[in-house]
């Protein structure tokens, strides 16, 4: 049974994450960027010269890992579904940086017996 108090009060601490240009390029390559070597729109994400980070890379930086597997949550992690994700950027993500992430559970809604719950987790990234 889900332990709502343990989930809602989960302390992730501050997560410091350093990534380099190589990481930025590998992320983009993993998305299929650069498959067409003549597509200049994609080359900016995989080539060192004037390298840019794919904006969605922010969704994987500063992750607290798979914390739902912690028995203290009471969650049946095998049945978890990632339902949706939202991203707000206030400036471009640097191609290389050290960031600090703060993760927090901002809401949890019980859908009823045997139907699970919806949890909203927020992650804020800032320059260190």
What are these model-predicted stretches?
Residues 1-82:
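Hot-dog-fold acyl-thioester-processing enzymes
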